[in-house]
Amino acid sequence: MDIIKTLYDYFPTSVYTGNSLVFISEDWRVELKEYKNTSFSANLKTVPIVRVKVFKKALNGEFLPGHYEDFQIDSVGELAAQIERYIQFSIGQNLRENV
């Protein structure tokens, strides 16, 4: 969860839930969560995997799961930049203004 706490500094409009970062707007919900490599042969320190899930609000008001992408970038600054770019292209809005 260290990477999620670190990413919180890059995304001040997000909400930290204890195990994920969540961005929410009237029409979208975006969730960032860290996943560990569960391979038994992976005893070496590896770059964490951050999964970004995008949900769109349906007509009934529920958020429906859409697409997701896994990011595994060593540099936290570059990781944050690529996640922000992915979210902006996914929802078609500027992350800092609308979500």
What are these regions (language model features)?
Residues 33-59:
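A short, structured beta-strand/loop element
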